[in-house]
Swiss-Prot record:
Its main location: cytoplasm. It comes from Pseudomonas fluorescens (strain Pf0-1). This is Ribosomal RNA small subunit methyltransferase A. Keywords: Cytoplasm, Methyltransferase, RNA-binding, rRNA processing, S-adenosyl-L-methionine, Transferase. GO terms for cellular component: cytosol. Belongs to the class I-like SAM-binding methyltransferase superfamily. rRNA adenine N(6)-methyltransferase family. RsmA subfamily.
């Protein structure tokens, strides 16, 4: 980045700017943007990934919260007809406003770690228009996203993201690739929405509710954590052993529990 484009990272925005050319190239090769792709970058920062995506010929919208970066990005990419900049909070951004065709939008970003989980859930609400997502996240978060049943990383984030997407932990990135260097390791993850849900729930809001309740006290058995929602007999009727802990259940089992809850007309989904 040239001196005229320098900008000091702001802690309140969770900014850690990517500067390692080798890492940037590896990310861009993983994304493999092509002419004609419809892409959205969240938190472009100083444009480390932006330039490479634009050079591919893809149509790129970017969403940046930091107002001080807007003129820098506009100046840096002035004259690029495939560049469109939005100043705002990605957590509040209406992705449908991009008018992307179903299963077409490719989302990328070096996400601020303090908003990564709520932002992923916000994106999952728009999974129907998304083709794939590539994110730089805290390594610990990526391990949770990609986790399987039986371990401590398996939880609400793993289950709800894997309900909607295939998860691929691509590679890790050390703190030295950033300025300033974060105190934790990072990783690149690829999320690909399922064309057909492998375990569709009757009501995904009930699935969210069951999973949330189950993991609120993850060391307790299901018959205890879910007692406000399902009786032990109902848990057993769903083909689940009520003496198990939530981390021992796979996605399909949680869907069966949610579907059992859906059979109770008095227990409507709670508002988010």
């Amino acid at each position: 980045m040239t001196e005229q484009y320098q900008h000091k990272a702001r802690k309140r925005f969770g900014q850690n700017f990517l500067h390692d050319a080798g890492v940037i190239d590896r990310i861009l090769r993983s994304i493999n943007a092509k002419a004609g792709d419809r892409m959205l970058e969240i938190g472009p920062g100083q444009g480390a990934l932006t330039a490479g995506i634009l050079n591919s010929g893809a149509q790129l919208d970017v969403v940046e919260l930091d107002k001080d970066l807007i003129p820098i990005l506009n100046q840096q990419f002035a004259g690029k007809s495939n560049f469109n900049l939005h100043q705002g909070d990605a957590l509040k951004f209406d992705f449908n406003s991009l008018n992307a065709a179903p299963n077409s939008l490719r989302v990328v970003g070096n996400l601020p770690y303090n908003i990564s989980t709520p932002l992923i859930f916000h994106l999952l609400n728009n999974a129907g228009i998304i083709r794939d997502m590539h994110f730089m996240l805290q390594k610990e978060v990526v391990e949770r996203l990609a986790a399987g049943p039986g371990g401590g990383d398996w939880g609400r984030l793993s289950i709800m993201v894997q309900y909607h997407c295939r998860v691929e932990h691509l590679f890790n990135v050390g703190p030295g690739a950033f300025n300033p260097p974060p105190k934790v390791d990072s990783a690149i993850v690829r999320l690909v929405p399922h064309a057909v849900l492998p375990h569709p729930a009757k009501d995904h809001r009930l699935l969210e509710r069951v999973v949330r309740e189950a993991f609120n006290q993850r060391r307790k058995t299901l018959r205890n954590t879910l007692k406000q929602l399902l009786s032990n007999a109902e848990i057993e009727a769903a083909g689940v052993d009520g003496s198990l802990r939530p981390e021992q259940l796979d996605l399909a089992a949680f869907v069966r529990l949610a579907d059992k809850l859906a059979e109770q007309p008095a227990k409507a989904p709670e508002a988010d």
